[in-house]
Swiss-Prot record:
This is GTP-binding protein Di-Ras2. One of its GO terms (cellular component) is plasma membrane. PROSITE patterns: RAS. It is an enzyme of class 3 (hydrolase). The keyword Hydrolase applies. Coiled coil: none annotated. A motif (Effector region) lies at residues 36-44. GO terms for molecular function: GTP binding; GTPase activity. The gene is DIRAS2. It is found in: Cell membrane.
Length: 199
C-alpha cells in the first residue's frame, strides 16, 4: 500500500522486550502473543475518517535494537506523533528512552506541537516493578508529554493510549471511538471543529 500524504504517522519506540509490538498488535488486531519475537520494523494501518475525508493511521513499530540508527532517524523525521514505551519492570528500559527523546527534539525542533506519550507497559507485573509511576510522571512533566501505564497482556489502557495520543494533536482533529462511545472531551472537541474517528 503506497504511503499517502494524508497518512497520520505514529512511531513507537522503546528497548527490546518492553512490549511495543504487543501494544500495537493488541490495538490493531486485538491479539496478544506470549512469546517474544524481535522486530526490525513493522507498519500497521487503520483507516480513519478525518474532517469528512479518509486518511490512514499508520503505526510504525520500530526495532528495540540500536543497530539501525538510520531507520530510527527516518521514523522520527516522518512521524507526526510518538509513543515512547518502557517496561515498569526495567529501569534500564526507561533510561534507554532518554536519547530517543533527545533525538526527537533534535530532528523535530518545535516540541510544543508534537504529540508524545510516555508509556509504562507491563503494569500487570506490578510485584516486579522497578519504576514507580510517580517517577515516570515527573519525567513526563519534564518532557512536557503525556503519561500512561498499560498492559498489552490484559488489554488495559491500550485503546485509551491511542485515543489520548490523538487528543494531543493540535494541528488537526483526529480521534478514535472507544467501544462506540465518545468521551465528553471528544464530543466537546467535535463541536468546536471537524471530527476524526476510526472506522
Amino acid at each position: 500500500m503506497p504511503e499517502q500524504s494524508n497518512d497520520y504517522r505514529v512511531a513507537v519506540f522503546g528497548a527490546g522486550g518492553v512490549g511495543k509490538s504487543s501494544l500495537v498488535l493488541r490495538f490493531v488486531k486485538g491479539t496478544f502473543r506470549e512469546s517474544y519475537i524481535p522486530t526490525v520494523e513493522d507498519t500497521y494501518r487503520q483507516v480513519i475518517s478525518c474532517d469528512k475525508s479518509i486518511c490512514t493511521l499508520q503505526i510504525t513499530d520500530t526495532t528495540g535494537s540500536h543497530q539501525f540508527p538510520a531507520m530510527q532517524r527516518l521514523s522520527i523525521s516522518k512521524g507526526h506523533a510518538f509513543i515512547l514505551v518502557y517496561s515498569i519492570t526495567s529501569r534500564q528500559s526507561l533510561e534507554e528512552l532518554k536519547p530517543i527523546y533527545e533525538q526527537i527534539c533534535e530532528i523535530k525542533g518545535d516540541m510544543e506541537s508534537i504529540p508524545i506519550m510516555l508509556v509504562g507497559n507491563k503494569c500487570d507485573e506490578s510485584p516486579s516493578r522497578e519504576v514507580q509511576s510517580s517517577e515516570a510522571e515527573a519525567l513526563a512533566r519534564t518532557w512536557k508529554c503525556a503519561f500512561m501505564e498499560t498492559s498489552a497482556k490484559l488489554n488495559h489502557n491500550v485503546k485509551e493510549l491511542f485515543q489520548e495520543l490523538l487528543n494531543l494533536e493540535k494541528r488537526r482533529t483526529v480521534s478514535l471511538q472507544i467501544d462506540g462511545k465518545k468521551s465528553k472531551q471528544q464530543k466537546r472537541k467535535e463541536k468546536l471543529k471537524g471530527k476524526c474517528v476510526i472506522m
